[in-house]
């Protein structure tokens, strides 16, 4: 018998079927979109040095 690992939705922590799941690693389209919204609203950030924006003058 093949042993399968348990996977959990990063947003709601429900157990997720990995195989044949079009939303993986999420459990649903809803959780996937909530996560995407968090990236867009900058709730999630990747650590590193801040680059100057194009609006800032280099003079």
From Swiss-Prot:
Cofactor(s) annotated in UniProt: Zn(2+)
Quaternary structure, from the entry: Interacts with GyrB.
Cofactor note: Binds 1 zinc ion.
GO BP term, pick one: regulation of DNA-templated transcription
Entry keyword set: Metal-binding, Zinc
Molecular function per GO: zinc ion binding
Organism: Geotalea daltonii (strain DSM 22248 / JCM 15807 / FRC-32) (Geobacter daltonii)
Superkingdom of origin: Bacteria
PANTHER family named among the record's database cross-references: DNA GYRASE INHIBITOR YACG
Gene3D superfamilies: Erythroid Transcription Factor GATA-1, subunit A
SUPFAM superfamilies to which the protein is assigned, alphabetical: Glucocorticoid receptor-like (DNA-binding domain)
Residues the record lists as binding Zn(2+): 9, 12, 27, 31
Name the record gives this protein: DNA gyrase inhibitor YacG
InterPro entries: DNA_gyrase_inhibitor_YacG, Znf_NHR/GATA
Similarity annotation: Belongs to the DNA gyrase inhibitor YacG family.
Function of the molecule: Inhibits all the catalytic activities of DNA gyrase by preventing its interaction with DNA. Acts by binding directly to the C-terminal domain of GyrB, which probably disrupts DNA binding by the gyrase.
């Amino acid at each position: 018998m093949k042993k399968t690992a348990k996977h959990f939705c990063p947003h709601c922590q429900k157990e997720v079927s990995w195989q044949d799941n079009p939303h993986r690693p999420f459990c649903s389209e809803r959780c996937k979109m909530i996560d995407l919204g968090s990236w867009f609203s900058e709730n999630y950030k990747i650590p590193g040095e801040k680059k100057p924006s194009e609006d800032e003058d280099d003079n």
